[in-house]
A protein has these predicted regions:
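ABC ATPase nucleotide-binding domains
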Residues: 74-231, 235
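ATP-binding/catalytic-site motifs of ATP-hydrolyzing domains
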Residues: 61-63, 67-68, 213
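Helix-to-loop junction immediately C-terminal to a conserved catalytic motif
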Residues: 52
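Conserved hydrophobic segment flanking the Walker A/P-loop of ABC-type ATPase nucleotide-binding domains
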Residues: 26-28, 350
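A short, flexible loop at the N-terminus of ABC-type nucleotide-binding domains that lies
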Residues: 1-6, 11-23, 72-73, 106
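The feature captures the beta-strand-to-loop junction immediately N-terminal to the Walker
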Residues: 37-39
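Conserved coupling/switch loops of ABC nucleotide-binding domains, chiefly the family-specific signature
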Residues: 58-61, 111, 211, 355
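Glycine/charge-rich catalytic "coupling/switch" loops of P-loop NTPases
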Residues: 252, 256-309, 338-367
Length: 367
């Protein structure tokens, strides 16, 4: 059983003008699967390396259990880490690669054999223990790297973009493998990725970062349904949320390009009470909340817009329909049968009960 906490953690490198990580606060429950996600340079890997002890903490505290770990050596933190690079020894067999850390720690041969064979069985590597890394596929090499961490029997697993070197199909398969592995091992896991799909499919909770600052912490459903700001709303979800700068007036939102839709009474009331009547707001709506079915168009005439097709992408079961109103281009996820040629005019209905509104200046959500 292990709980972790990062309290007011900062990281600033020597001679740097800005902090790489600013006031990072997070409580992690025992056996929780936490994902740090954000664009390159947001501080997610730096934070992971501070937890591992590979980077010093400039300010703040890291606790594992009830012990402050700031000055504890990496080897004494009872942490196992999996890196983006497999870092396998090419001259060693799979068995020896997985056993290497245990040998350094002077475990006896029987215990090493037991741990390696158990990890190999979990990862489906039992028949490959005598092979060298060159004889393995990319997915098998990544499993060996995971096995090297598993044999440690550590309290905490840290994973720094472990799937980024794999092709798209293999990444999907390995996502499921890591999720199943976490359930089997019952460990606390912290996983770093720039891929929001990995974060959404694997995490118990997601920590979304930008410029070294936490933007939002929540379950995948929470960050998808109730994003805290424009950055989170645009980062989580694929395709990304559409944004329009609009003016609120007499229950309608409009823009210069010709967008005009009527808000549900409850949504309009919130915006008016917050002082946005007659002012600009950012209107966000996800592609899956824009509809082209005639039954929806007929039922919601005040939420319909006419737009011009830019391009249609047929993806089998659905079509990504890129259209524009005036100069504003947006994307809708519609039925595969709604395939249109560029230049055609189409009518679309916004599900305004699923709309999001943000302040123009702060870009924070309006609730």
């Amino acid at each position: 059983m292990v709980e972790m906490a990062l309290r007011h953690v900062y990281k600033k490198y020597d001679n740097a003008e800005k902090y790489s990580v600013t006031d990072f606060n997070l409580e992690i429950a025992d056996r929780e699967f936490i994902v740090f996600v954000g664009p390159s340079g947001c501080g997610k890997s730096t934070t992971l390396r501070m937890i591992a002890g590979l980077e010093d903490i400039s300010e703040g505290e890291l606790l594992i259990g009830d012990k402050v770990m700031n000055d504890v050596a990496p080897k004494d933190r009872d942490i196992a880490m999996v890196f983006q690079n497999y870092a396998l020894y090419p001259h060693m067999t799979v068995f020896d690669n997985m056993a290497f850390g245990l040998k350094l720690r002077k475990y006896d041969k029987a215990e090493i054999k037991k741990r390696v064979e158990n990890a190999a069985q979990i990862l489906g590597l039992s028949e490959y223990l005598d092979r060298k890394p060159a004889a393995l596929s990319g997915g098998q090499r990544q499993r060996v790297a995971l096995g090297r961490a598993i044999v440690r029997d550590a309290k905490v697993f840290l994973m720094d973009e472990p799937l980024s070197n794999l092709d798209a199909k293999l990444r999907v398969a390995m996502r499921a493998e890591i999720a199943k592995l976490h359930q089997r091992l019952n460990t606390t896991t912290i996983y770093v990725t720039h891929d929001q799909t990995e974060a959404m499919t694997m995490a118990d909770r997601i920590v979304i970062m930008k410029d070294g600052i936490i933007q939002q912490i929540g379950s995948p459903k929470e960050v998808y349904d109730t994003p805290s700001n424009v950055f989170v709303a645009g980062f989580i979800g694929s395709p990304a949320m559409n944004f329009f700068k609009v003016t609120l007036k007499d229950g309608y939102i409009t823009n210069d390009g010709g967008l005009k839709v009527k808000l549900p009474e409850g949504r309009n009331k919130i915006l008016v009470e917050k002082g946005y009547e007659g002012k600009q707001v950012i209107f966000g709506i996800r592609p899956e909340d824009i509809h082209s079915e005639r039954v929806v168009l007929d039922a919601t005439p005040d939420a319909c817009v006419k737009s011009t097709v830019v391009v249609s992408e047929l993806l089998g079961a659905e079509t990504m329909l890129y259209t524009k109103i005036g100069d504003t281009e947006f994307v809708s996820r519609v039925d595969a049968r709604d395939y249109h040629k560029p230049g055609e005019e189409v009518e679309l209905a916004f599900n305004l009960n699923k709309a999001h509104f943000f302040d123009v200046e702060s870009e924070e959500v309006i609730r």
